[in-house]
């Protein structure tokens, strides 16, 4: 009997034989018998272990190990191997030992492997090559001798390769139909054969009661359509039936009017323009086009043909009375509209008129295409940006317009158009009528444009404009005009998610009840106007609706050779979105390279995510990342890539995950490196002014740039401008830096407390939001559990107050304090921490607590301790050593409050993360909690990636580990600690986004419990940090939310401890307020809800 085959003949052999196959990689032959079991027993146990089964030899069954590669990956490898030279075959076999096998690791999770998966893959490659080479007359004889020809996907791959190489479709079984062009990798024929034998066995032993059908014997067994997407990711109602659509006619908001009284313009004071012209907002550098006038731009017959249809949309049921002297005018909306503020289920859709009259709309097509052509010729930059931004689903007749406003006999008062795409222009044309006057006047230009039937005006609709008087209105004047534009709301995350759910429903309708056998699925296939978006079939159900929407947004932009910014709240899964995007691009362009830039601490997070989702089919043959753990492997991968670049090896696409500090060296090494796609994680770094990183990336000449950031705006609005300008260079041409800064200044002025700047701030806010909408996918909301965010103002002990006076920490002095001055922070932690810091004798907890008293008594300003200070420091050390912990803790308000929070969390058997900026504070917190016998683990910036991973694992798995102490500025990135549902920010940084990142370590996807955040501030240093934070938060909300916000005044903050709705928390606040420090000051002075530190203006 050949080596590796054995005959089962003992009563306990099935389990032991399968154990041997699984652990040794050898194959085994079994026969049905009372001692082994029937066919159902053999197949079900084999499937449970994910092993393979072949129906040979006659009367028996061959059990094979699980194939450690995905089906399509094995196909690609076999294709390469079959076409390779002998030397290249050796290299391919050697490379098998250098790669990862996540499927193998998963299948062996309960077994110890005695073989390398590369050995098994090598055998399959060699067999496929041999099968391709044998003469036609010998092919069928292999069927009885090779179990590989009875398992999928090896069987299909062999037939496929032979068809390509030899042109003969000789299949293992002549009765089988030819292999389809698109391979379906499953063991259907084997399963049918086995099922038939099993059915015969069951018919003989019918008294056994029957059994369920056998699943297809393949690692990828297919996915039912109902399981393709997760719950909530598929549209629930049929939009094609009129009964399901609410009639919202007239509820569209297209104007922004900022006055209680209608203001009408007259021709006096305006220059009348009658000749073709282009107008700019100012002369000189940085000017932008604001109006293009084209008299006779469209043939009159084309206009009147369109008017016959469009005039039917006009109605007096509308919200535009403010621009018509208080009475509703004759106006209507055609095309698509975003009803984001309406209480309706479907927000983004056709207007009622459009839905009922699409059949007539073809009469307007010629007019729209005429206007679109004029637009592209006379304002090409605006037109291109609008072409990039508009979702294909909302294009009217293939143009860059999504929406048309139709006005009849409507002399508009002064207004601006609300919700138009600000990187584009509105296109105005008169299409019917007999009248005189009623010119369109733009106030800032002091120009009025004569518009007769066929005349066209492209203009910036954010500028205040209105119609001049009608001449001889008593002559029954008639005038029909249209404005064509792109509604920015249609590009919102709400609309993107609605689109995605609709597409998912169409996909499921196409599939009907057919099981999905492909390992990948094009989730955009239902709409031919969309670019393909390939996702691993098993992964599709793991992607949340917001992730699917983000992917759709990105691929539409990259398909139009533009980049974009993905601004999603931390924890919503941006990394998975980016990896899926890489997968789709490599599926379409297998030889393309992708560059991912990420901060060094997050590289390991990318590797972990890649490994985690690999079990769902998200795998990459060449994923090169340096996380500091496998530097040798990283260098070997670079050498392999170098050989490809030198044409020594076949080209294969690589995904490089590197940090920005290494980028320069990488580009020096690979001078011809031309990535197809660049992804920048924590991409707000490319927004820094004069950034060398952007200079390096610009030299790569890659237009497909995707920025990932939960915090795209860190300090001021100019960062956002540089960020959007980096992903699409054309944006700065339509909104020069000077103009953007004027808008940002208007917002800043209001945010910082100037209520008189409210009107200008609103205008600027709306403009910036509409300008960036086409290039920024923003989703700041989430469906996570509740977040309770509190600001706890802690008291100071008499010792702390004494040192505050010594340092001159008055309010006046503190306003001038440099951000780099750490003394107040250490003092608010504990006087011991402060004294140790200024004496320069602090050692970490690894070395223990030591005090080196100075021999001389110098002044405090010399950073040496006075005698009394040295005695105090020694006294504090003794308190810790003698476990006089309450006495030690009560010298600091922050420490007292922190310890009580920790003990409360411990009593509830929950977990807590403590973030601090300073090593001294981290060490003191760790030492104090350890002395209290609270199991605590600390992760700091200098710690290795291995220690961080160990911390994540321990914190998740060890029930006794209650507290993690983390460095805010380092450990706040790339780590997930959803085991914790309490977060303490022991001190805060000037940038609120650093704190937001820290909170997101616990408050993120996969968090199942409500999360409570405690921000501890002292009465000294932290309130100035808080003022800086609230200003920036107000700015962020102004720009990324439709909220005009400002800093709350101190008098507006209300202590919420007494009206706390949670009884247990209310009692806890009362207990803290009743606790006194040394010197009889309360440990807790006030409790505020953090969100109330920023106020919305109504």
From Swiss-Prot:
<comment type="similarity">
    <text>In the C-terminal section; belongs to the SNF2/RAD54 helicase family.</text>
</comment>
<dbReference type="InterPro" id="IPR038718">
    <property type="entry name" value="SNF2-like_sf"/>
</dbReference>
<keyword id="KW-0238">DNA-binding</keyword>
<keyword id="KW-0347">Helicase</keyword>
<feature type="domain" description="Helicase ATP-binding">
    <location>
        <begin position="555"/>
        <end position="730"/>
    </location>
</feature>
<dbReference type="InterPro" id="IPR000330">
    <property type="entry name" value="SNF2_N"/>
</dbReference>
<dbReference type="GO" id="GO:0046872">
    <property type="term" value="F:metal ion binding"/>
</dbReference>
<dbReference type="GO" id="GO:0070580">
    <property type="term" value="P:base J metabolic process"/>
</dbReference>
<keyword id="KW-0479">Metal-binding</keyword>
<dbReference type="InterPro" id="IPR027417">
    <property type="entry name" value="P-loop_NTPase"/>
</dbReference>
<feature type="region of interest" description="DNA Helicase">
    <location>
        <begin position="541"/>
        <end position="1098"/>
    </location>
</feature>
<feature type="binding site">
    <location>
        <position position="479"/>
    </location>
    <ligand>
        <name>2-oxoglutarate</name>
    </ligand>
</feature>
<dbReference type="GO" id="GO:0016887">
    <property type="term" value="F:ATP hydrolysis activity"/>
</dbReference>
<dbReference type="GO" id="GO:0004386">
    <property type="term" value="F:helicase activity"/>
</dbReference>
<dbReference type="InterPro" id="IPR001650">
    <property type="entry name" value="Helicase_C-like"/>
</dbReference>
<keyword id="KW-0408">Iron</keyword>
<dbReference type="InterPro" id="IPR024779">
    <property type="entry name" value="2OGFeDO_JBP1/TET_oxygenase_dom"/>
</dbReference>
<feature type="domain" description="Helicase C-terminal">
    <location>
        <begin position="897"/>
        <end position="1057"/>
    </location>
</feature>
<keyword id="KW-0378">Hydrolase</keyword>
<dbReference type="GO" id="GO:0050341">
    <property type="term" value="F:thymine dioxygenase activity"/>
</dbReference>
<dbReference type="InterPro" id="IPR049730">
    <property type="entry name" value="SNF2/RAD54-like_C"/>
</dbReference>
<dbReference type="InterPro" id="IPR014001">
    <property type="entry name" value="Helicase_ATP-bd"/>
</dbReference>
<feature type="region of interest" description="Thymine dioxygenase">
    <location>
        <begin position="1"/>
        <end position="540"/>
    </location>
</feature>
<comment type="similarity">
    <text>In the N-terminal section; belongs to the TET family. JBP2 subfamily.</text>
</comment>
<feature type="binding site">
    <location>
        <position position="417"/>
    </location>
    <ligand>
        <name>Fe cation</name>
    </ligand>
</feature>
<keyword id="KW-0539">Nucleus</keyword>
<feature type="short sequence motif" description="DEAH box">
    <location>
        <begin position="681"/>
        <end position="684"/>
    </location>
</feature>
<keyword id="KW-0223">Dioxygenase</keyword>
<feature type="binding site">
    <location>
        <position position="465"/>
    </location>
    <ligand>
        <name>Fe cation</name>
    </ligand>
</feature>
<dbReference type="GO" id="GO:0005524">
    <property type="term" value="F:ATP binding"/>
</dbReference>
<dbReference type="GO" id="GO:0007131">
    <property type="term" value="P:reciprocal meiotic recombination"/>
</dbReference>
<feature type="binding site">
    <location>
        <begin position="568"/>
        <end position="575"/>
    </location>
    <ligand>
        <name>ATP</name>
    </ligand>
</feature>
<dbReference type="GO" id="GO:0003677">
    <property type="term" value="F:DNA binding"/>
</dbReference>
<dbReference type="Pfam" id="PF00271">
    <property type="entry name" value="Helicase_C"/>
</dbReference>
<comment type="function">
    <text>Dioxygenase that catalyzes the first step of DNA base J (beta-d-glucosyl-HOMedU) biosynthesis by converting thymine to 5-hydroxymethyluracil (HOMedU). DNA base J is a hypermodified thymidine residue found in the genome of kinetoplastid parasites, which is localized primarily to repetitive DNA, namely the telomeres, and is implicated in the regulation of antigenic variation. Probably also acts as a DNA helicase. Recognizes and binds specific regions of the genome, hydrolyzes ATP and allows the DNA base J de novo synthesis.</text>
</comment>
<dbReference type="InterPro" id="IPR050496">
    <property type="entry name" value="SNF2_RAD54_helicase_repair"/>
</dbReference>
<dbReference type="GO" id="GO:0005634">
    <property type="term" value="C:nucleus"/>
</dbReference>
<dbReference type="Pfam" id="PF00176">
    <property type="entry name" value="SNF2-rel_dom"/>
</dbReference>
<protein>
    <recommendedName>
        <fullName>Bifunctional helicase and thymine dioxygenase JBP2</fullName>
        <ecNumber>3.6.4.12</ecNumber>
        <ecNumber>1.14.11.6</ecNumber>
    </recommendedName>
</protein>
<keyword id="KW-0560">Oxidoreductase</keyword>
<keyword id="KW-0547">Nucleotide-binding</keyword>
<dbReference type="Pfam" id="PF12851">
    <property type="entry name" value="Tet_JBP"/>
</dbReference>
